[in-house]
Amino acid sequence: MIFLTGVPGFLGTRLMRSLADTHPDASFGLLVQPKFEDTTRQVLDDLDLADRAEVLPGDITEPDLGLGDRYDAIADRITMACHLAAVYDLSIPRDVGWRVNVTGTRHVLDLLD
């Protein structure tokens, strides 16, 4: 499974489309904040990838990525990962940027360790 963060954002969506083209047999696990689940499902439908992707409601700022009991099973299935979830607005408060961009990245790396 190719694990992605950052979908349905601009970069994450384009990377997923590219990976789907270059890895036609791959499946995707998409870590998505619950508030973006519907948008993500629409993107998957638009790209004709709904049958190849599993939407994983979660949050990179949580130690277990919000995956709870599914954490280990998901980690065991990952063959490739691309972490694109981030806050790009430099005017945000420092603590928010740190929590998402630094701590969130650490949590994704922990999943892959």
Model-derived segments and spans:
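N-terminal Rossmann/SDR dinucleotide-binding element
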Residues: 1-84, 94
